[in-house]
């Protein structure tokens, strides 16, 4: 090849080189763009899964609490360690829930770290750790969530009366209320409580519902105690320093050291206003009636809150609870 040929070949090479380099750059950019798009898709999927778990945790936890409560209600046998048993069942259900993501190539893990009381007695606090991985992406989040005992598509029953009355005839469910028949009177009699007969055929609320009359003195400061009657008719519960928390109710404890709740246990109506102000019976607050430690069950004086034809509806309240609910002190 003569010099002219070499020059032409060299010129052609330098003409082709920029095009080749440009092609390499375009290929590299295309590859990076595809990788970026895939990373973005994976990132959105990972965050979406984490959000899904965070949203569904309270619903699954509420189902666990409901089922554990029904277990105690139906058997009358308390849980030995409610926090541990609820946590274990919660973990089992979350493991099952997380496994559905395996077919999508996503590793999902939710560890239930702790189940315990919340600052709000109408909630249960759950601490958990969520891990979601896909490819090289990994997302971790620690959560502290409150599971409501009152808000949701299904009620959560109070298990305590069914534990206390087991072996004394048993409490039964009558629509939205607990009917005691003779079981509560038998329970009180077995403990040597005076005037236990006042609770023959008594009733109390079945499901946990938070009372809207706050502050609680609003119960008693209306004409004819209308708010108190509405509270009783609706079966509301109230915050209480003395009443048992829900997790301890699952263990059959009438009182506990935690900030808890209380409700009224309603004596059967009488056919005459026979109760004079000097008569007494166990105070109609559940933690008083179900406090079987020492002298925890104390008496209250009757208060008539409603009458209709020949039926008279009364509560027995001690002065401490009268003051709490705005009812005249005896």
Task: Mark where each language-model region is.
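Glycine-centered recognition micro-motifs in short, flexible terminal segments and loops
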Residues: 1-16
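Alpha-helical hydrophobic helix detector
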Residues: 13-25
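Long, compositionally biased, intrinsically disordered regions
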Residues: 23-330
